[in-house]
Swiss-Prot record:
EC number: 6.3.4.4
One Pfam family named in its UniProt record: Adenylsucc_synt
One of the GO biological process terms: IMP metabolic process
Binding site for substrate: 295-301
This protein's name: Adenylosuccinate synthetase
Top-level lineage group: Eukaryota
Localisation per UniProt entry: Cytoplasm
Family designation: Belongs to the adenylosuccinate synthetase family.
HAMAP family assigned: Adenylosucc_synth (MF_00011)
Length: 424
């Protein structure tokens, strides 16, 4: 098996879907390793726009088989709704090319209710979750009381475990705006439909062990990783290279490329430290020109300059072999472009490649910037590297040097599927 892994290098929303879509055209198998329907990205294919959340974007390729892996959490109503939406838009046969690991966990409506209650209790220190129930679902998984997808098929086991979860949360929160009987009734119907999609993951993957092109689609990003991100303002899964390997039982020697997706500036949704965030006209311009609204939540994304401290840290953990720089065209109309190159910590220490583990400390760092000249010309839809303005190429090559020579092999120049430069 030859495996390529696509990972977000910042706080998500980097544009991973487009490179995944492009690579999926040659892939036999495309896998999601972690996360749930809290993830979200958009792919423009022909004259149609597809929004993906829990489903792998390899579904756009008619020859690619897709797997939702063991590290994910699956909201079953969203799975069927998203699948129906894709088929209505013309992705015929998508339902025949998607499978779910029996070891993935079930994200319930109960979890969404609890998510809202937990956020409310945090008050001013809330995490800023998507409200989709992802955190409570992973919490139940870690506490060994969660429900796996394979257990949906055993009605008695599913009912016993769901009633136990309901009772436990009622003991903690009191009365809930949740009806366990309604959810049990819904799953009585889903049980009839789910059987063909559920697979023993290891046996399933063994069928593809000789495939030269397997693609792993990361969700969220390194700075939202449960261990390495800006804890506690993170998601509840392992979003980096290690998480992908664990969730899909990957042989390390089979990995042929790890692709880090880097937005040409930085965005973040939700609460938490964001050192290079811009509370000024530059931030507003990045937000409006980049149309920075979350696919899943619709929330306005926070915007700032490219932060190379974050990128170096991400590179050190995920070991990228190549980079995809996205949304270069959003910077077309800036006279000058700033890049964060170092942090000055509250004690005066300067760091270029590490992120303080303490979120309170990270909130207080000062960013050291370099200023690069803008290019003030249109890069939208450019297909060849040599056709980019000189200063745009200088910006890309500066990033390569600062990230230890990892090549920027792909450059996004617009929202369309083919608005991408592929460098040799």
């Amino acid at each position: 098996m030859g495996v390529s892994i696509v990972l977000g290098s910042q706080w998500g929303d980097e544009g991973k879907g487009k490179i995944t879509d492009m690579l999926a055209q040659q892939a036999t198998l495309c896998c999601r390793a972690a996360g749930g329907h809290n993830a979200g990205h958009t792919i423009v294919h022909g004259n149609k726009t597809y929004d993906f959340h829990i489903l792998p974007s390899g579904l756009i390729s008619p020859s690619c088989i897709n797997l939702i892996g063991a590290g994910t959490v699956v909201h079953v109503p969203s799975f069927f709704k998203e699948l129906a939406s894709l088929e209505e838009k013309g992705l015929e046969g998508a339902s025949k090319r998607i499978f779910i690991s029996d070891r993935a966990h079930v994200c319930l409506q109960l979890h969404s209710v609890v998510d809202g209650l937990e956020e409310a209790k945090l008050g001013g220190r809330k995490v800023g979750t998507t409200g989709k129930g992802i955190g409570p679902c992973y919490s139940d998984k870690a506490s060994r009381r969660g429900i796996r997808v394979g257990e949906i098929l055993d009605e008695a086991v599913f009912e016993r475990k769901l009633r136990s979860l309901d009772a436990g949360y009622r003991a903690r929160f009191g009365d809930l705006e949740y009806n366990v009987e309604e959810e049990l009734a819904q799953f009585k119907e889903y049980r009839k439909l789910l059987g063909p999609y559920i697979v023993d993951q290891l046996a399933f993957l063994q069928k593809y062990k000789d495939s030269p092109n397997t693609l792993v689609e990361g969700a969220n990003a390194l700075m939202l990783d449960l261990d390495h991100g800006t804890y506690p303002y993170v998601t509840s899964s392992s979003t980096g290279l290690g998480g992908a390997m664990q969730a899909l039982s990957l042989n390390p020697t089979s990995i042929k490329s790890v692709i880090g997706v880097v937005k040409a500036y930085t965005t973040r949704v939700g609460s938490g430290p964001f050192p290079s965030e811009q509370f000024n006209a530059d931030g507003d311009k990045l937000q409006s020109v980049g149309r920075e609204f979350g696919v899943t939540t619709g929330r306005r994304r926070r915007c700032g300059w490219l932060d190379l401290v974050v990128c170096r840290y991400s590179q050190a953990i995920n070991h990228y072999t190549a980079l995809n720089l996205t949304k270069l065209d959003v910077l077309d109309d800036f006279d000058e472009i700033k890049v964060g190159v170092a942090y000055i910590l509250p004690d005066g220490t300067r760091t270029e490649n590490t992120i303080p583990a303490d979120a309170e400390v990270l909130e207080k760092v000062k960013v050291e910037y370099v200023t690069l000249p803008g290019w003030k010309s249109n890069t939208m839809g450019v297909k060849k590297y040599e056709d980019l303005p000189d200063n745009a190429r200088a910006y890309i090559e500066y990033i390569e040097r600062e990230l230890g020579g990892v090549p920027v092999k792909w450059i996004g120049t617009g929202p369309a599927r083919d608005d991408m430069i592929a460098r040799e």
